[in-house]
Amino acid sequence: MEMASRQIVAFGGGGFSMESGNPLLDDYVLGLTRAERPRVCFLPSASGDADHDIVRFYRAFSAHRCEPSHISLFRREQGPSDLRRHLLSQDLIYVGGGSVVSLLGVWRAHGIDSILREA
């Protein structure tokens, strides 16, 4: 299968975090990966790794349609230990909404900003 080109899809609102009964936006971004079972990592950093956002993500991106994961930067005892390796292995990196100031600060502290530029 041909590898999808790298791209950024940005949207404000919608998707699993705002429209739990409407999978159209989530289906669209999954389809962009062109992978049969895309690896999808959720970064809930902007919401301070809010549990309700993580639960909604796993409900929307269930294991039967993709391989979901998330990275909690405010609770590093959870999730993958090698952030770079994990993020670079993903077909889709889904960044959740919230405070951009908080997001940028915690990303810089953990090197996520540099990893995402590389992805």
PLM features: residue spans?
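Hydrophobic N-terminal alpha-helices or hydrophobic patches in metabolic proteins across all domains
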Residues: 1-119
